[in-house]
Amino acid sequence: ENKLEPLSDEFFDTSDENNYYVNGVSPYIDRVFRENEIDGEPWSDYAAGYMWGITGMVYNPEEVTEEEASTWSILENEKFYRQVTIKDNVRDAYFPTLAILNKDLLNSETFRNTSDYHEQLSAIMNDTRKETIDESEQKLKEIRQNVYSFETDSGKADMITGKVVANLQWSGDGVYTMDQAEDDDFYLDWAVPEECTNLWFDGWVMLKSGIGEDAAKKQAAEAFINFLSRPDSAVRNMYYIGYTSAIAGGDSPLIFEYADWTYGAEDDEEDTIE
């Protein structure tokens, strides 16, 4: 739509030690941003990774079994009438309907063992043909009759207070919800639907309407991205919001040390980190 300002060549200069983003971004995420294109241009020309994760279900294991939570069909499961929430945005409401409509294929071993599984899966879950959208709309209408709400933020509190027993959630908000519940001695769990889930990325971009021809503004915007990409900034950010940074840290050990501290085994548990 010609609304974004491309990142400068200077932003990608690895010889500049203040370019924390290019020197510290996860190699995997860097590759994803370079290989995926829109209108022939890679994401990396315009976007710098911020956070990333998946979507899944936060659920109350006293009310919902792991098997019941491990499928997108929980959204239409009448056993949980008005006890499950779904996201109130196009992408995260559309995606589950495609998984439900194609669940038999997605769960088949034959399909999963095909040599181009990921390519076929991507095609199915990014299908925007009119007939597919129409089928998705009908499925969403059915889901709407069963769920407690379409929400963006309220699902976290609804889970903690017990208004609902399962909540479609982004992974970082899932961590936040489970941590808050644990503070109240209330145990919640997390499940990834067996059909598939989506891998999402948040990224920083610059709007042409905001930058214009002002080189100082562009330099300031890129400096802001680099500030947030400093390993110490990334750790503080992850700690506060519960999400996973796109920054791996480069030569700095801070990111790994934080991940080990947060998710590593307790003293009386087996450490599985290699």
Positions of predicted regions on the chain:
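Short helix-loop capping/hinge motifs at secondary-structure junctions, enriched
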Residues: 63-70, 103-111, 210-221
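Hinge/lid segment of periplasmic solute-binding proteins
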Residues: 1-52, 66-73
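Periplasmic-binding protein-like
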Residues: 14, 133-141, 185-208
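Small-molecule pocket liners
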Residues: 53-56, 95, 201-204
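Ligand-binding pocket segment of bilobal, Venus flytrap-like solute-binding proteins
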Residues: 86, 92-100, 104-189
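Mature extracytoplasmic/periplasmic domains
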Residues: 204-273
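Ligand-binding "clamshell"
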Residues: 2-7, 42-44, 177-192
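Short loop->beta-strand "edge-of-pocket" segments that line small-molecule binding or catalytic clefts
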Residues: 73-91
